[in-house]
Amino acid sequence: MLTQYHRFSRFLNQTYVAGNETALFGLLNMPNDLVLVRHGASEGNLAFAEEKKGNYQVFTPRFMETHESKWRLTRDGRNQARAAGQWIKENLNIFFGAYICSEYVRAIETASLLDLPHAHWTRQVFLRERNYGRMSGLPYAE
């Protein structure tokens, strides 16, 4: 079993291939530019926004039983991801050396909906939000 150190070390020393392009991504080959895209609005974002308005109806049994890593994008979140991808294609028409996203469903959905040419996404455990264990997904009041 790989330790987190070994997984992180392997992550920092990978070669990425996209189409006819190859990029090294390691300590000595770090990119000059870094483009970060946050996931679009998710079920969790919607639930906590509604809670701030005093609406607790969104905290259904289904929502409460779903681990935060499985929260999906909302319709608005899918539209946000498509719009971000369109903006990137129109304004940053460059080859990216690596395409990396979190293993969370909402991040994977966002990556896919960006629809970037030649993107071969790598899921990385180190790119995720904080997890508060059993407290994750609870209304703030609790």
Task: Please provide the spans of the model-predicted regions.
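N-terminal mitochondrial targeting presequence
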Residues: 1-2
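Active-site-proximal alpha-helix that buttresses catalytic centers in soluble enzyme cores
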Residues: 6-21, 25-119, 123
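Short alpha-helix plus adjacent loop in nuclease-associated cores
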Residues: 127-141
